C-alpha cells in the first residue's frame, strides 16, 4: 500500500504542501505559458495549412503542405528540438538555445515550435480531409449554385463543420503537449512542470512524481470535458 494515495483527498501530498508555501509555484506558469502558446500555434497554423491544401487539392500547394505534414508527424520532438538548437542557435545565432528569462518571446520560440510541430502536421491533415469532404457536400454545392463568393462559402458554411474533427483531436493533442513538454523543458532547460517531473523521477522523489501525475491527470480530464461541451455547442446533432 502506498500511504500517499490515501493522502490525496486530504491535500497532504508533499508537492502540494510545497505548492502552498510557494516554493514551486513558479513552475506551473512556465509550463502553462509554453503549453498554451504551442497549442494555439498548432491550431492556427494547422487549420490554415489544412484549408489551403483542401482548396488547392491535387496541386503543388497540396503536395507541399501534405509532404511537410507527413514529415512533421514522423519526426519526434526530441529529434526536432536539438536540430532547432543546432540550426538557429549554434549555426545562425538567431535565437537563444535554452533558458527562460522571464518568458521573453525569443526564449519561447524554439521550444514552442519543437513542441507544436507534430500537432501542426496532424491538425493540417485532419483539416484537409474534413474540408474536402465538406466541400463536396450538397449544401456547399447549393451555395455555389446560388452564386455566393467562395470566401463567404468557406468562412460562413464550410469551416464550421470541417473543424469538428479538429475539435475532437484537441483533447489528445493537449495531453500530448503536456507530456511532450517534459522532454522539451529538459532539453531547453526551462523551469517548468516537465523538468520538475524529470528531476523528481531521477531523484526518486515519488511523492513529487505522484502529485504531478495527479495534477496532469486532472488537467487532462478538465480539458476533455471542455472539448465535449464545445463540441455540443458547435454541433447541434449531439445535443441531448
Where are these regions (language model features)?
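Short clusters of hydrophobic/aromatic residues that line enzyme substrate/ligand-binding pockets
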Residues: 5, 94-95
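A hydrophobic, multi-pass inner-membrane permease signature
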Residues: 72-80
Amino acid at each position: 500500500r502506498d500511504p500517499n494515495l490515501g493522502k490525496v483527498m486530504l491535500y497532504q501530498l508533499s508537492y502540494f504542501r510545497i505548492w502552498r508555501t510557494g516554493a514551486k509555484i513558479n513552475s506551473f506558469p512556465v509550463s502553462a505559458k509554453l503549453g498554451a502558446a504551442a497549442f494555439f500555434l498548432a491550431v492556427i497554423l494547422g487549420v490554415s495549412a489544412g484549408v489551403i491544401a483542401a482548396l488547392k487539392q491535387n496541386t503543388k500547394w497540396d503536395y507541399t503542405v501534405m509532404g511537410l505534414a507527413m514529415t512533421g508527424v514522423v519526426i519526434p520532438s526530441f529529434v526536432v528540438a536539438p536540430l532547432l538548437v543546432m540550426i538557429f542557435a549554434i549555426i545562425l545565432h538567431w535565437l537563444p538555445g535554452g533558458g527562460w528569462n522571464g518568458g521573453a518571446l525569443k526564449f519561447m520560440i524554439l521550444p514552442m515550435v519543437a513542441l507544436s510541430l507534430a500537432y501542426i502536421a496532424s491538425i493540417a491533415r485532419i483539416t484537409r480531409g474534413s474540408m474536402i469532404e465538406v466541400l463536396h457536400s450538397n449544401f456547399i454545392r447549393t451555395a455555389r449554385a446560388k452564386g455566393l463568393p467562395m470566401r463567404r462559402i468557406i468562412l460562413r458554411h464550410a469551416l464550421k463543420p470541417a473543424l469538428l474533427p479538429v475539435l475532437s483531436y484537441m483533447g489528445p493533442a493537449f495531453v500530448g503537449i503536456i507530456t511532450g513538454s517534459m522532454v522539451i523543458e529538459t532539453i531547453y532547460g526551462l523551469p517548468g512542470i516537465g523538468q520538475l517531473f524529470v528531476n523528481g523521477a531521477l531523484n526518486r522523489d515519488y511523492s513529487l512524481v505522484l502529485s504531478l501525475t495527479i495534477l496532469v491527470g486532472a488537467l487532462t480530464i478538465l480539458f476533455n470535458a471542455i472539448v465535449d461541451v464545445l463540441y455540443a455547442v458547435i454541433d447541434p446533432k449531439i445535443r441531448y
